[in-house]
From Swiss-Prot:
Family: Belongs to the MLP family.
GO cellular component, one term: cytosol
Name of the molecule in the record: MLP-like protein 28
Primary gene name: MLP28
GO term, biological process aspect, one: defense response
Biological role: Can bind steroids (in vitro), and may also bind other types of hydrophobic ligands.
UniProt cross-references to Gene3D superfamilies, sorted A to Z: 3.30.530.20
Pfam family of the protein (one): Bet_v_1
Organism of provenance: Arabidopsis thaliana
Length: 335
């Protein structure tokens, strides 16, 4: 990790500006090993995961309005800065996926006690001629008085969070790559944000999976119970679905059900997936969103391929995302 290079000419510019006004800006670059796309996605697509990467600095990020990574949406951060627990309510001002850029405007919270306005822009650029990226942080602000300090410690906070996110992303890559070198085992995970309650979404898979086809008829054509009871460990269900534009089937055994965690695990025991995988487990866990309505659906696919030629089931993970969104719409329409 290269040393952080704060741009001194910019500091001079800040000092000159401050002589006549309370407006200022600070910038710095952080060199990381992760890809620009993945780092950008942490703030645009899943900022609620930043707390996993940097738990000492960020305790949580909740969506208050709109959708993750969409201009106009409101997010709410819990963080620790200068040894104090703080909060920030921010509106997403700009998102440019092709430039891996996102801008947040602080609209409420601790920073508003000292600043009339505060914008944070994060832009991530792939390093020319090599792996890794450069994270460029740009803070633009207006202080409420001359007594307020420039947010240099907050800029350092951004640097620390960047480094921890980088480590987190690299660890995630290793987690997938390491098992694949000696074996054919892998796992894929994703989160889907929904507006429906965790219990109702979980019940669609545990209590009435035969209703999923009503919610997502283009993807799921039916689910029949072959043995046991719906939502019971050991029961066998049989799915008819369309994936990669082909009609397919899957016979699955329910491996685990934890209603208090809104969790269910299916093990594929027969069907099209068994042509390419020795084993395949799908776990669906739904968690209520902290401090607001809605939930997060976490999909976890764990599998062993029959050969290196078999692709990772990334298109199946995307299929799960699409089905989740359609179930959400179906549940909201029922309300």
């Amino acid at each position: 990790m290269a040393d952080v290079a704060t741009k001194h000419p910019m500091e001079d510019e800040v000092k000159k500006t401050e002589a006549s006004s309370l407006v200022g800006k600070l910038e710095t670059d952080v060199e990381i090993k992760a890809s620009a796309d993945k780092f950008h996605h942490m703030f645009a697509g899943k900022p609620h995961h930043v707390s996993k990467a940097s738990p000492g600095n960020i305790q949580g990020c909740d969506l208050h309005e709109g959708d993750w990574g969409t201009v106009g949406s409101i997010v709410f951060w819990n963080y620790v800065h200068d040894g104090e627990a703080k909060v920030a309510k921010e509106r997403i001002e700009a998102v440019e996926p092709d430039k891996n850029l996102i801008t947040f405007r602080v609209i409420e919270g601790d920073l508003m006690k000292e600043y009339k306005s505060f914008l944070l822009t994060i832009q991530v650029t792939p390093k020319p001629g090599g792996p890794g990226s450069i994270v460029h942080w740009h803070l633009e602000y207006e202080k409420i008085s001359e007594e307020v300090a420039h947010p240099e410690t907050l800029l350092q906070f951004c640097v620390e969070v960047s480094k921890e996110i980088d480590e987190h992303l690299l660890a995630e890559e290793e987690e997938v790559k390491t098992p694949e070198t000696p074996s054919l085992v892998g796992k894929l995970e994703t989160d889907v944000e929904i507006k429906a309650s965790a219990e109702k979404f979980h019940h669609m898979f545990a209590g009435k999976p035969h209703h999923v086809s009503k919610a997502s008829p283009g993807n799921i054509q039916g689910c029949d119970l072959h043995e046991g009871d719906w939502g019971q460990v050991g029961s066998i269900v049989f799915w008819n679905y369309v994936h990669d534009r082909e009609a397919k089937v899957a016979k699955e055994r329910i491996e685990a059900v934890e209603p208090n965690k809104n969790l269910i695990t299916f093990r594929v025991i027969d069907g099209d997936l068994m042509k390419e995988y020795k084993s395949f487990l799908l776990t669906i866990q739904v968690t209520p969103k902290l401090g607001g309505p809605g939930s997060i659906v976490h999909w976890h696919l764990e599998y062993e391929k029959i050969s290196e030629e078999v692709a990772h089931p990334e298109t199946l993970l995307q299929f799960c995302v699409e089905v989740s969104k359609e179930i959400d719409e179906h549940l909201l329409a029922e309300e």
